[in-house]
Amino acid sequence: MVGSRFEVDCGQVGHGGFVVARTDEGRVLFVRHALPGERVIAEITEGTTGDSFWRADAVQILSASPHRVTPPCPYAGPGGCGGCDFQHARSDYQRELKAAVISEQLRRLAKRDLTVEVEPVGESSLGWRTTMTYVPASGGGHGLRRHRSHEVQEIDQCLIATADAQPGCPPLTRAVVGERTFDVPDGGFWQSHRDAPQTLVDAVLAAARLRLGDRVLDLYAGVGLFAAFAAGAVGESGQVIAVEGDPSAAASAKLNLSDLPQARVIAADVAAWLDSSASPQGADVVVLDPPRAGAKRRVVEGVCQREPRAIVHVACDPAALARDVALYAEQGYDLRSLRAFDLFPMTHHVECVALLT
């Protein structure tokens, strides 16, 4: 089956960087490197007769979308690097596709109809990524994985990476946001877009509307980015507790927040900590930035049990966010606003900041 080719009409965008199409026999295809409305030759890359859908690449464009452009990267396209999904689409149209995915996931998983706009961030869709993980290539150089594969595409440069994140460059270990400097452990998590930290801090603070004296929980706190600015907003009469499960990130957070007496760092699993008697039973505001899989029921229930007046939920996966929004609704917290940011241009990924009250 792999390698077979079909002429298909491409439908709506799907969650994961593909568009949905059907063969004449009704077989569902998830087609990469295509755009809605195009007619393409799709070559099957994964699938057997018993599968509910097959994965495919658009290897020939028979009728092109007006939103199609020539990919700037020579490694983008079928069989190349798997990092970027939408280099063949105009930047504004990429954001439209991502907005459609967010709306569809909220409608399908949270039963919420919401018009979403994905906001552009930065001046360019290239040269934005400050952290990269390259793998050794057989030729002795560096490369990136192909899509859904362990095979390596050797590259000489990555066009979405900054000059300091090209192959052979040392990893990011320190970052400046506003007037604060953050220690970042080697290999630890840090927002990859160079403008993401300030963008998200501004969005979180705008949603949280913190007051002097507030008690704030910052869950999945990483190296303390949100906690640092929340501490400034609540003042020394307030309190910020930052909870992070990764020991190296928690150690960096303690260093980064050491000048803020109202901030405290707890190195612990978030769900277990919320269940423990050591955690406070109340909070005015909860900020959480869970991993891609989402917060899930145990954490959502633990957060809501604190009865905060506001929950600010940062999410990098629309489906996980929608599932969590549905869980919040079960606990009486409704989605009041949602902002989406194009922090991952050229890819299908998108960042959301949701306010629930």
Show the residue positions of the predicted features:
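Rossmann-like S-adenosyl-L-methionine
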Residues: 1-4, 169-357
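Non-catalytic substrate-recognition/targeting regions of SAM-dependent transferases
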Residues: 12, 56, 126-195
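Short cysteine clusters
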Residues: 73, 81-84, 316
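Iron-sulfur (Fe-S) cluster-binding segments and ferredoxin-like electron-carrier domains
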Residues: 79, 86-101
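A short, contiguous, amphipathic alpha-helix enriched in charged residues
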Residues: 98-111, 163-164
